[in-house]
C-alpha cells in the first residue's frame, strides 16, 4: 500500500461515501472519522447500511457483484480504493470478525497459525499462537487442547478464537459485525471485556443492535437511519444521522431521531 498525500489524524476516514448495488443506492453521503485505538459503534435499524459501510472499510463489498462505492475511504493516509491498492493487503491490515463464529475446519492451533503462515510470518509460531489466544482471552480455555478441532469449542469460545485468528495476522483495525448476536449473555460479557483490552493495540469498529452494548463498549457511536427512496423505486436508503462520543450521544443526542432510537421508540 503506497502512501498518498492525504493528511488525516484518524485511523479511518469516510469521505462522502455512497454505496449502491446495481442501480439501487444502499447508503449515501457518509462522512465520519474513526479515531485510533478507540472503539466506535455503528448502530441503527435493520437496513440502514451499517453493515454495508463496515464491509466497505476493508473492501469486503468488492466480492459482491454490482456493488459500487463513490467517495473515499482513507486508511492511515491512504485511499484504499485507489487503483494501485491491493485489496488483499487492505484486508490483512483491516481484519474482520463476522456475526456467526466461523472457525476453520482445523485444529485450534492451526486456526491461528494458518493465516499467519499464509501471510509470511517467520517468527516463533508457538509464541504467536499463545499471544493471540491470550489477547482474545481464550488461552486458558484452549491451552491444553490446541490439537483439537476449533469446532470443539463453545460458541463464545469459537468467536474469541476467530478474534485471535484476526489478531495473529497483525492488523491495525478490527471490524466486528454483530459479533455477539449469536451468543449467550455470559459469552457476550467475555467478548466485551476482550474488546476493552484489544483497543490498547487496535482500532475497533463494531456493528451492534444492542444499545446497552454500544454504551458499554464504545468510545464513539455512529447512528444510521433510513429514508424512503423515490416512490417508483421503492425501498429505503441508509444515511448517517449523527456521529459523536458515545457518552454525548446517549446523554444528549443532537437529533430527535437519535433520541427516539436509543430510547427504544423504533428500531
From Swiss-Prot:
Known catalytic reactions: phosphate(out) + ATP + H2O = ADP + 2 phosphate(in) + H(+)
EC number from the UniProt entry: 7.3.2.1
Bilayer topology annotation: Peripheral membrane protein
One record GO biological process: phosphate ion transmembrane transport
GO cellular component terms, A-Z: plasma membrane
Keywords: ATP-binding, Cell inner membrane, Cell membrane, Membrane, Nucleotide-binding, Phosphate transport, Translocase, Transport
The keyword Disulfide bond is assigned to this record: no
UniProt-recorded Gene Ontology molecular function terms: ATP binding; ATP hydrolysis activity; ATPase-coupled phosphate ion transmembrane transporter activity
Gene3D superfamilies, alphabetized: P-loop containing nucleotide triphosphate hydrolases
EC main group: translocase
Pfam families per record: ABC_tran (PF00005)
Transport listed as a keyword: yes
Subcellular location: Cell inner membrane
Annotated function: Part of the ABC transporter complex PstSACB involved in phosphate import. Responsible for energy coupling to the transport system.
Subunit structure of this chain's protein: The complex is composed of two ATP-binding proteins (PstB), two transmembrane proteins (PstC and PstA) and a solute-binding protein (PstS).
Sequence similarity: Belongs to the ABC transporter superfamily. Phosphate importer (TC 3.A.1.7) family.
Name recorded for this polypeptide: Phosphate import ATP-binding protein PstB
Organism, as annotated: Prochlorococcus marinus (strain NATL2A)
Gene: pstB
Amino acid at each position: 500500500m503506497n502512501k498518498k498525500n492525504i493528511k488525516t489524524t484518524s485511523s479511518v476516514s469516510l469521505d462522502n461515501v455512497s454505496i449502491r448495488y446495481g442501480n439501487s443506492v444502499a447508503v449515501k453521503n457518509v462522512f465520519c472519522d474513526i479515531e485510533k485505538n478507540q472503539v466506535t459503534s455503528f448502530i441503527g435499524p435493520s437496513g440502514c447500511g451499517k453493515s454495508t459501510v463496515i464491509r466497505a472499510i476493508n473492501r469486503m463489498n468488492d466480492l459482491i457483484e454490482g456493488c459500487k462505492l463513490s467517495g473515499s475511504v482513507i486508511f492511515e493516509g491512504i485511499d484504499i480504493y485507489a487503483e494501485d491498492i491491493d485489496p488483499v493487503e487492505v484486508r490483512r491490515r483491516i481484519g474482520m470478525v463476522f456475526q456467526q463464529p466461523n472457525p476453520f475446519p482445523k485444529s485450534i492451533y492451526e486456526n491461528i497459525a494458518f493465516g499467519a503462515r499464509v501471510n509470511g510470518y517467520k517468527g516463533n509460531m508457538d509464541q504467536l499462537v499463545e499471544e493471540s489466544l491470550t489477547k482474545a482471552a481464550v488461552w486458558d480455555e484452549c491451552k491444553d487442547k490446541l490439537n483439537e478441532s476449533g469446532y470443539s469449542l463453545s460458541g463464545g469460545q469459537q468467536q474469541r478464537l476467530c478474534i485471535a485468528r484476526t489478531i495473529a495476522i497483525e492488523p491495525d483495525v478490527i471490524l466486528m459485525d454483530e459479533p455477539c448476536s449469536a451468543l449467550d449473555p455470559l459469552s457476550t460479557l467475555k467478548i466485551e471485556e476482550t474488546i476493552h483490552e484489544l483497543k490498547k493495540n487496535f482500532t475497533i469498529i463494531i456493528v451492534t443492535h444492542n444499545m446497552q452494548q454500544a454504551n458499554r463498549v464504545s468510545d464513539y457511536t455512529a447512528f444510521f437511519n433510513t429514508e424512503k427512496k423515490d416512490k417508483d423505486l421503492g425501498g429505503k436508503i441508509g444515511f448517517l444521522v449523527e456521529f459523536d462520543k458515545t457518552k454525548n450521544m446517549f446523554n444528549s443526542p443532537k437529533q430527535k431521531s437519535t433520541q427516539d432510537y436509543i430510547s427504544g421508540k423504533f428500531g
